């Protein structure tokens, strides 16, 4: 299997995840999550798992072997690297944080992976007696690495979970990109947005009179909005069904056809007779561990699945802890804002481990649609979601 095909598989897996989250956790609400963040966390968990658990994770994310796991990890992580100058109109960063109980230490191979492949910051903490401090530390870390967009990934309600934890792995993604062709704010006006229940809300719509990357397909159309570029290329894609209530049908089609997103990329700019996109801003959070288990990924959440992460040779009574580690919870939170200037978005994933084409067209996004933000060269999907009601912030 080529690396490119492996990356495409990651996209298909995350589309299936979206299909599962939308009718259950996100039922009737706007949705945004980061496939990149969740995928990297799963790869990291796989690297510290026993053979049987690792095989299930590899099968779940459609990778044939650990060699491909390492290659996909390197490719995904490299998307955030920028060899050029820092710029104010384009920024993507990822960060990795680890909190390990003071009674444990990392196995050398896993420590090497954390420090050299992920450049992770590692912290020793006291989960049992100071869980509130750990929660505050993780939340402060998340706030710093999302530029203040996500101030809380662990709530006070999670204190029992944290008290029983021995290890926390976290990933944060932050993206800010300016449109390559910005919208003129003076042209932004309020129009009706048609909800799935047939009602309408007034929301501000952006427009311009430039040619757009737009392509028509049977039952839907796809818009590609590029951001400014460095050596990487980022774009937002909006998948708009022709029917105002057609989003569920479109989602079913997207999730049932492999490579759908990769096979529906507008390549040509065309003139538009009508072009309107709503501004939107919202956040979404869910317990990803529940969704992953419902989708069949169960072994990481069973006793003794994470045998390659930690050790405690100097404290014999803790040996069973190192051998019986498992994932207790995976929390995920993301937010996004789209306006005339561009897009700002962020996401955090936290896993706690416990011992136990036309010449002229139109694109008026005045009813529910799907969207993605992706890096074009690698195909990595940074963010994915649905907009049901852009008036809800």
UniProtKB/Swiss-Prot annotation:
Annotated keywords:
Protease inhibitor, Serine protease inhibitor
Q: Where is this site: Reactive bond?
A: 356-357
User: What's in the GO CC field?
Assistant: extracellular space
Q: Which InterPro entries match?
A: Serpin_CS, Serpin_dom, Serpin_fam, Serpin_sf, Serpin_sf_1, Serpin_sf_2
- Region (RCL) residue ranges read 342-366
Q: Per its record, what are the GO molecular function terms? A: serine-type endopeptidase inhibitor activity
Q: Which family does it belong to?
A: Belongs to the serpin family.
Q: What does this protein's UniProt record list under function?
A: Probable serine protease inhibitor.
Comment on protein domains: The reactive center loop (RCL) extends out from the body of the protein and directs binding to the target protease. The protease cleaves the serpin at the reactive site within the RCL, establishing a covalent linkage between the carboxyl group of the serpin reactive site and the serine hydroxyl of the protease. The resulting inactive serpin-protease complex is highly stable.
Q: What is this protein called?
A: Serpin-Z4
- Species of origin reads Arabidopsis thaliana
């Amino acid at each position: 299997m080529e690396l490119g095909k492996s990356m495409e598989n990651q996209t298909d897996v995350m589309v299936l995840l979206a299909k599962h989250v939308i009718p259950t956790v996100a039922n009737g609400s706007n949705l945004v999550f980061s496939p990149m963040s969740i995928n990297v966390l799963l790869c990291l968990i796989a690297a510290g798992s026993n053979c049987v658990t690792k095989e299930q994770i590899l099968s779940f994310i459609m990778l044939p072997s650990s060699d491909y796991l390492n290659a996909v990890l390197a490719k995904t992580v490299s998307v955030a690297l920028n060899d050029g100058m820092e710029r104010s109109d384009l920024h993507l960063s990822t960060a990795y944080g680890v909190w390990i109980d003071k009674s444990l230490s990392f196995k050398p191979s896993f420590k090497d992976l954390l420090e050299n492949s992920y450049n992770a910051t590692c912290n020793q903490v006291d989960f049992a007696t100071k869980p509130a401090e750990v929660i505050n530390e993780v939340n402060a870390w998340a706030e710093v690495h999302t530029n203040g967009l996500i101030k809380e990934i662990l709530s006070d309600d999670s204190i029992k979970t944290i008290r029983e934890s021995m290890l926390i792995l976290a990933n944060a993604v932050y993206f800010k990109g300016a449109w390559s062709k910005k919208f003129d704010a003076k042209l932004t006006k309020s129009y009706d947005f048609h909800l799935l229940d047939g009602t309408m809300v007034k929301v501000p719509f952006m427009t311009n009179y430039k040619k757009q990357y737009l392509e028509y397909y049977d039952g839907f159309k796809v818009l590609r909005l590029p951001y400014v570029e460095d050596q990487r290329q980022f774009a937002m894609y909006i998948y708009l069904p022709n029917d105002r209530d057609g989003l569920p049908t479109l989602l079913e089609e997207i999730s049932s056809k492999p490579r759908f997103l990769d096979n529906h990329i507008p390549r040509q700019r065309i003139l538009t007779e009508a072009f309107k996109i709503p501004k939107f801003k919202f956040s979404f959070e869910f317990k990803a561990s529940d969704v992953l288990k419902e989708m069949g990924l169960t072994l990481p959440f069973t006793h003794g699945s994470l045998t390659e992460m930690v050790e405690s040779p100097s404290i014999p009574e803790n040996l069973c802890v190192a051998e019986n580690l498992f994932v207790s919870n995976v929390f995920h939170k993301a937010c996004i804002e789209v306006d005339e200037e561009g897009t700002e978005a962020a996401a955090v994933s936290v896993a706690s481990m416990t011992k136990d084409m036309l010449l002229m067209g139109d694109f008026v996004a005045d009813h529910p649609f799907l969207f993605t933000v992706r890096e074009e060269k690698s195909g990595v999907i940074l963010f994915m979601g649905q907009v049901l009601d852009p008036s809800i912030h």
